[in-house]
């Protein structure tokens, strides 16, 4: 079965971040900024571990009533968050896509 991949990149300010990309090329999870590449790589490892378990996801709403979700580690720290969706059903599908792709070991540095 085809799986997505992680894109690890340097932000404009020199910090590091990553996206989890689905098989269709869509960004399905975006990390916070990390001061070091090693810290970002640890973040990816945390998504690989925690992103396969539905209990680690939390659904939220923006002020304009757009649903999105965050992925949390076992220590309750946020690891990544989704885009904003048009419906709760779409956000649910996004979460399922993260769960299906999180365990990929493919990391592309861009």
Please report, for each region that a protein language model flagged, where it lies by residue.
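Short Pro/Gly-enriched beta-strand edge/turn motifs at strand-loop
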Residues: 1-2, 53
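A structural feature that tracks compact, well-ordered secondary-structure segments
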Residues: 7-9, 15-23, 28-34, 43-47, ...
């Amino acid at each position: 079965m085809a799986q997505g991949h992680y894109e690890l990149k340097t932000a404009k300010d020199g910090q590091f971040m990553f996206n989890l990309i689905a098989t269709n090329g869509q960004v399905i999870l975006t990390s916070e900024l990390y001061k070091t590449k090693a810290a970002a790589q640890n973040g990816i490892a945390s998504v690989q571990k925690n992103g396969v378990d539905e209990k680690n996801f939390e659904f939220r709403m923006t002020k304009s009533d757009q649903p999105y979700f965050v992925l949390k580690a076992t220590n309750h720290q946020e690891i990544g968050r989704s885009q904003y969706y048009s419906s709760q059903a779409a956000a649910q599908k996004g979460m399922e896509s993260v769960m299906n792709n999180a365990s990929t070991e493919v990391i592309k540095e861009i």
